[in-house]
């Protein structure tokens, strides 16, 4: 199937599965390994959400974001978040045209299909708020005038761990707007050699990946994801997982209902990537940490114990009955 054919008529879940595999194969030509993490990034995009890649520098976060934009055929913009970045640097601003004697609006980097918000936690909260409106509402407001953003619109943000010098802790409201938070981690020895080998063979730094879809294809695939069946027992399992985080002894603030919704949305998309038109409990388990961990606040007195939101989610997973499983 050629680019642009996926969206012809109504995209079924089978076509969305085929599109997903084409996109992942394309991205895999640039990003070595990390298949599970790449599947989760694509699942978040297919579910219509935004992704936070939180990891140390040099582990392929920016490369992955750019590769997905190329493979999906989306208009791509990169914004480098720095301590002196202003909201207008993201949204755009009104400029006076002396020839026409009027103000005209100059669009900022938010006017795109896929925004790479690089090192998003290095900019002050005021600028982060401008990004939050775009993520939450799909629009921006400049001097009282509202501008709708393009569809599809997705943010892939990268962040360094908060222990790094010069970082601002992302506010809970903004973290909650990311459908998933992921970490690639360090590659193993074979993967790291593959990175070097590819670079040596290429003889240049830049690399591009083949386009596997376009914006219309992505929108059609997102509609197909909405048709994935959710059994009530699996839906209640998602609710039980989110609710269990609120009652955990180490948690100050557990996952909100948006967390249980994120579980369903991500699990739906992952089911499509895996070739099914229904959610299985295994899909929910696979997305639980990326969907819930960043929505959990640990009690301050436990900050020095290295307990994380991911630890809480894993403990909740092990203690919550799985649908269809015997007690």
Segments (PLM) and residue ranges:
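Terminal-proximal interaction/regulatory segments of ATP-powered molecular machines
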Residues: 299-327
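Canonical AAA+ ATPase core
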Residues: 97-102, 122-127, 135-228, 268-273
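Pre-Walker A (pre-P-loop) alpha-helix and adjacent loop at the N terminus of AAA/AAA+ ATPase modules
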Residues: 15-59, 239
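Walker A/P-loop
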Residues: 45-82
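AAA+/P-loop NTPase substrate/partner-engagement loops
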Residues: 71-99
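Basic, amphipathic alpha-helical bundle interface domains used for macromolecular binding and assembly
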Residues: 200-304, 309-310
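Single conserved hydrophobic/aromatic residue that forms the stacking wall/gate
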Residues: 1-11
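Conserved alpha-helical scaffold flanking the Walker A/P-loop in AAA+ ATPase domains
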Residues: 39-43, 96-116, 145
